[in-house]
């Protein structure tokens, strides 16, 4: 494990290491602040290192703050981040992860400037390259159920080999293997 100070300063390293250990982002959809700590403890104990609280959950910034402070070894942050102001609010709450259903260059640049890992939602090679050019640490292929493993394989053939691609939306235990064989690095589940 990294020292706490180093973990707090290099979110991208924590992202890479967490994704290698457990290729799943736990999406804590609808979680309340009261539920957040016991759920996060169970997930971290089970090996999860990437925890996302969607901003459309009840009082998400309180949950993010509680989880981030209780589990500094984990990369904790928000999903459904659509605007720059939300990036700043997540950062102020202690979050270091920004996940979006779409690609917004301003959101990516704001997150990167704050040393936060940013995973914007993309569906096409054009969006994927634009997101990477803006500084995204990885790509959220969303909704994955609308994109076949064959399309994922074609996209991976042209994307940089180092680009991390996560499938989110409609992912099931039954289709994970096909997506991984096509080049997916991880999944968002929740």
Show where each model-derived region lies.
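Short, Lys/Arg-enriched N-terminal segments with co-localized hydrophobic residues
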Residues: 1-7
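Conserved N-terminal beta1-alpha1 strand-loop-helix module at the mouth
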Residues: 7-96, 103, 113, 173-174, ...
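Alpha/beta catalytic cores of nucleotide-metabolism and tRNA/nucleoside-modifying enzymes
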Residues: 8-10, 25, 112, 116, ...
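Hydrophobic faces of well-ordered beta-strands that scaffold small-molecule active sites
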Residues: 24-28, 51-53, 76-79, 98-99, ...
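Glycine/Thr-rich beta-alpha phosphate-binding loop at enzyme active sites
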Residues: 48-53, 91-93, 114, 124-153
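Short acidic active-site motifs
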Residues: 63, 85-86, 106-107, 126-128, ...
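Hydrophobic, well-structured mid-protein blocks that either form specific transmembrane helices
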Residues: 87-127, 131
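Glycine-rich phosphate-binding active-site loops on the catalytic face of alpha/beta enzymes
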Residues: 101-107, 140-148, 184-190
């Amino acid at each position: 494990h990294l020292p706490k100070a180093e973990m707090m300063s290099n979110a991208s390293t924590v992202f890479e290491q967490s994704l290698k250990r457990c290729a799943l982002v736990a999406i804590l959809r609808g979680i309340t602040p009261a539920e957040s700590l016991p759920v996060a403890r169970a997930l971290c104990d089970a090996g999860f290192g990437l925890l996302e609280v969607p901003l459309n959950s009840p009082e998400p910034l309180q949950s993010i703050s509680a989880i981030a402070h209780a589990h500094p070894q984990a990369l904790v942050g928000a999903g459904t981040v659509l605007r720059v102001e939300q990036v700043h609010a997540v950062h102020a709450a202690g979050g270091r992860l920004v996940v979006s259903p779409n690609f917004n260059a301003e959101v990516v640049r704001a997150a990167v400037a704050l040393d936060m890992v940013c995973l914007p939602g993309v569906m096409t090679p054009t969006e994927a390259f634009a997101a990477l050019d803006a500084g995204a640490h990885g790509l959220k292929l969303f909704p994955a159920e609308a994109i076949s493993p064959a399309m994922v394989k074609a996209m991976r053939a042209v994307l940089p080999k180092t680009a991390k691609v996560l499938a989110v939306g409609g992912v099931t235990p039954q289709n994970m293997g096909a997506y991984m064989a096509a080049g997916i690095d991880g999944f968002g589940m929740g």
